[in-house]
Amino acid sequence: MNKIKPKKRLGQHFLISKNVIEKIVDEINISKEDIIVEIGPGTGALTEEILLRNPKILYAIEIDTSVHPVLEEKFSIYSNFKLIKSDFFDVNLYELISDEEKIKLVGNLPYNVASLMIIDCAFKLDILEFCVFMIQKEVAEKLIAKPKTKDYTFLSVFIQTFFDIKYVMSVPARFFNPPPKVTSAVVKLTPKQNIAINNVKKYKNFISHLFQNRRKMIKSKIEEEMLNKAGISPNLRAEELSVEDFIRIFGVVENDDR
């Protein structure tokens, strides 16, 4: 296993702290009925702890061909372990479950695509029980940011629309191989119920549009008549609006488009 070198191009930093691994798996709260999907298992440190807790099945999605033999050998004794040799974005999670089953999605996400992976989760709400991710602390702070703060961005609004977010803990660089140049964090994302957004892709584009030139007043992006219908001052900037404000404006715009 020591021969496996983390690949910079894949944004790999392997978690090596047993204590942190156990805390992450505690947060997953595994039962024997659970279907767990792990993104980027690497050499299997988190994978091993998950399997020790005996879920119904663990699918490990790994793009790096150099670790495939390591994972296959290490976990060959587990009948509930399935390795998917693929890019996460090419895997259809819906094919891994039966009707009404849900997935616990976990992983130490590659820093270079973590935000894209989290955004992708908003398009799979109906099959996710929750997500537990290790990500860059800077990204985690954006996920939980409030209006009128520097960390409040498109990502904050979009993800807070669809998920309740728990900041579990910070993880120093020394707990990884190689140590990243930044601090990491563990977050838990639980899908909200009864979300008033029917077209997630359109909503995503809408939020992204409003956050372009975030210091500009929103009346430069949305007709004042629409803003008045939504009960929003046209002189506000995107960074000053709450998640509820964005949802309300989008609802008015959607109705007008019909």
Curated annotation (Swiss-Prot):
Pfam families: RrnaAD
Annotated S-adenosyl-L-methionine binding sites: H13, L15, G40, E62, D87, N108
Source species, domain of life: Bacteria
Catalytic activity annotation: adenosine(1518)/adenosine(1519) in 16S rRNA + 4 S-adenosyl-L-methionine = N(6)-dimethyladenosine(1518)/N(6)-dimethyladenosine(1519) in 16S rRNA + 4 S-adenosyl-L-homocysteine + 4 H(+)
Compartments reported by the entry: Cytoplasm
GO molecular function, one term: 16S rRNA (adenine(1518)-N(6)/adenine(1519)-N(6))-dimethyltransferase activity
GO CC list: cytosol
EC number assigned by the record: 2.1.1.182
Keywords of this entry: Cytoplasm, Methyltransferase, RNA-binding, rRNA processing, S-adenosyl-L-methionine, Transferase
Gene3D superfamilies assigned: Ribosomal RNA adenine dimethylase-like, domain 2, Vaccinia Virus protein VP39
UniProt-listed NCBIfam families: ksgA
Family named by the database record: Belongs to the class I-like SAM-binding methyltransferase superfamily. rRNA adenine N(6)-methyltransferase family. RsmA subfamily.
Function: Specifically dimethylates two adjacent adenosines (A1518 and A1519) in the loop of a conserved hairpin near the 3'-end of 16S rRNA in the 30S particle. May play a critical role in biogenesis of 30S subunits.
Protein's recorded name: Ribosomal RNA small subunit methyltransferase A
Organism: Sulfurihydrogenibium sp. (strain YO3AOP1)
